């Protein structure tokens, strides 16, 4: 399903080259819970970003469903992220003025899904994470664990094959962290979950595979995938997805914008008022400038009319002058 072949990632800082990943080769099963452990700066998040199509590898190859990504264009990466990947981060990234249901629906607005289907799939995803009775709440009315559940529901609503989690329990207390890990473990029964974490205890307890990185290299893999072993894939049959070009309708974009304006009436009014003052000020300055120019022109015309300028022509008789000089 997902295979990394000798992946290398380099960053250039001035004249120096920093090696984030050095020849990483990993094969993943179609459904498993993989935890990536390592010290800060060892390349964990870089690895996750490359798998998710958020960053490009320098060398090597990322193979998705048996297809190389070396020739992938931006549109191909967009389709891959939109249909095959779900992201869960340490920060929930929820829109505060939208309800829980609307936040989850938002993930489907780029997939060309009808409004009724979006609503139904969002409800099902929230029920799956245990928030079926919290649909109308806003994010600021929920606990950290509940908001992370909303983020997980948003990642699942598009039915991705792979769920990428970057420190999903980093901002949660120990009890809530356990709840989130239990949820991820349940999801991993039919999806590939790759989680970056600094918590080895949670990783060892809930993951069925742990990969350790050091200085951009894989130094340990507790349960490597042997491609010679044929695993049952009956639960994946019939899941072929029809790739659609990601897009958001103008009506949806307008609706989101108006909703944002209406939920922040005070700021919208103050912004409009300040903008109006600016526009009125510019119009006033232009009017004064135009009036002053007209007044100056009027004064000039009146002054010239009172003191007319006369032009006379004088001629000199050069013949008589020459005659007198020759005498």
PLM regions with names:
Residues 52:
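Helix-to-loop junction immediately C-terminal to a conserved catalytic motif
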Residues 83, 186-195:
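Conserved catalytic loops of ABC-family nucleotide-binding domains
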Residues 157-161, 190:
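A short, proline-enriched helix->beta-strand linker immediately N-terminal to the Walker B motif
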Residues 163-166:
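Catalytic Walker B motif of ABC-type/P-loop ATPase nucleotide-binding domains
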């Amino acid at each position: 399903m997902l295979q990394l072949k000798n992946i290398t990632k380099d960053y250039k800082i001035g004249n120096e080259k920093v090696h984030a990943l050095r020849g990483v080769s990993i094969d993943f099963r179609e459904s498993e819970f993989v935890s990536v452990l390592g010290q800060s700066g060892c390349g964990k998040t870089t690895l996750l970003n490359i798998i998710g199509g958020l960053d490009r590898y320098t060398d090597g190859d990322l193979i998705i469903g048996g297809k190389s990504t070396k020739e992938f264009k931006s549109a191909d990466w967009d389709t891959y992220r939109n249909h095959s990947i779900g992201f869960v981060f340490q920060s929930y990234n929820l829109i505060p003025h939208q309800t829980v249901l609307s936040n989850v629906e938002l993930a489907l607005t780029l997939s060309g899904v009808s409004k009724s289907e979006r609503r139904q799939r969002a409800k099902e995803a929230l029920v799956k994470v245990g928030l079926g009775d919290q649909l109308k709440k806003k994010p600021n009315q929920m606990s950290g664990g509940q908001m992370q559940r909303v983020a997980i529901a948003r990642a699942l609503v598009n039915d991705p094959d792979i769920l990428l989690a970057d420190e999903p329990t980093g901002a949660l207390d120990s009890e809530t962290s356990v709840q989130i890990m239990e949820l991820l473990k349940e999801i991993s029964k039919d999806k590939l979950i790759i989680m970056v974490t600094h918590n080895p205890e949670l990783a060892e307890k809930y993951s069925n595979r742990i990969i350790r990185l050091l200085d951009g290299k894989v130094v340990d893999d507790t349960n490597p995938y042997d491609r010679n072993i044929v695993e049952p894939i009956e639960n994946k049959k019939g899941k072929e997805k029809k790739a659609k070009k990601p897009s958001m309708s103008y009506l949806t974009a307008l609706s989101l914008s108006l909703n944002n304006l209406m939920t922040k009436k005070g700021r919208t009014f103050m912004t409009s008022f300040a903008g109006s003052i600016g526009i009125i000020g510019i119009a006033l300055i232009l009017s004064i400038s135009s009036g002053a120019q007209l007044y100056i022109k009027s004064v000039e015309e009146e002054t010239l009319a009172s003191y007319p300028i006369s032009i006379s022509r004088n001629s000199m008789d050069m013949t008589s002058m020459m005659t007198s000089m020759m005498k």
